[in-house]
Amino acid sequence: MKYSAIALSMVSLLALSACDSAPQSSAPASTEKGASITLAQAVNHDDRTPAYVQRDEYRHPQQTLEFFELEPSMTVVEIWPGGGYYSEILAPYLANEGTFYAAHFPEETQSDYYQRSLTKFKERLTSEAVFGNVQLTQFAPVTPLETDIAPPSSADRILTFRNLHNWYMNGGEEAVLSAFRQFHQALVPDGVLGVVDHRLPEAAADDAMANSGYVKESWVIELAEQAGFELVESSEINANPKDTADHPNGVWNLPPTLNVEEGDDASVYEAIGESDRFTLKFRKPVQ
């Protein structure tokens, strides 16, 4: 299969401090080949979107990527990167030694939202030097496309953040299985799949997954294992014990969406914060 890529010209990389012990403020506005930066530097660089930085309190990007054992020389695929919260971190981190595929929404999608999101992401790729090494591919969970998210057996890491519930809500269990199978095909043996999503309590009714935006951790593990993965470890990095996962408008009641009905008190949901999330690390076994 073929795959498409957007590659931008790369210019000089500013020298960055090698200290990991505290947040550093730098500006890797360009991605010329040279010494790799640390993950802490990638998380704390000055080119990140301020609104995204404010969400680090709940999304814990450095701890999450460390849990997935990223290295700057790896080939990494981010699935459905949206506006680029994680791409802003991954692009400069992988610029000098690694390869970064952003597998965004399908080009031929009928969804206006998907088209707008993809168009905005493309604009960022062509206008912001921090994205100079990004190779743009596309991903569809239900029906695999003629193009790949990355060449088969090439990716060291595949990462998906808060996407799986959408695949289930729009395509059911088979869409999730199809996604996992595509990831399995793209990963190298011993490669890692990292999954973060909104967590539905195990005691809740299964049908709550249909429209709440929350899914059960045990169910995700079961489907990943059906697709050939082994669970390596789970983490509570992105847990939020304040979130009951039982809201009138599902996860969208909570920040950052705050989809609150007229007359409801938004401060109740702001006090909860962003959703309770599971963080799972799977491995593609060596045959």
Q: Where does each model-flagged region fall?
A:
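C-terminal motif of bacterial Sec signal peptides marking the signal peptidase cleavage site
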Residues: A15-A18
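Conserved beta-strand signature within the Rossmann-like core of class I S-adenosyl-L-methionine
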Residues: Y101-A103, D190-H198
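Class I SAM-dependent methyltransferase Rossmann-like catalytic core
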Residues: A35-E71, Y85, I89
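Bacterial signal peptide processing site
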Residues: D20-A22
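A short glycine-rich, Lys/Arg-flanked "PGG" loop and its adjoining helix->strand segment in the class I
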Residues: A91-P92, E174-P189
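A short acidic, Gly/Pro-enriched loop at the edge of an enzyme's catalytic core
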Residues: T147-L159
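Conserved class I S-adenosyl-L-methionine
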Residues: S73-G82
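C-terminal lobe and adjacent flexible extensions of AdoMet/dcAdoMet transferase-like proteins
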Residues: A227, S267-Q287
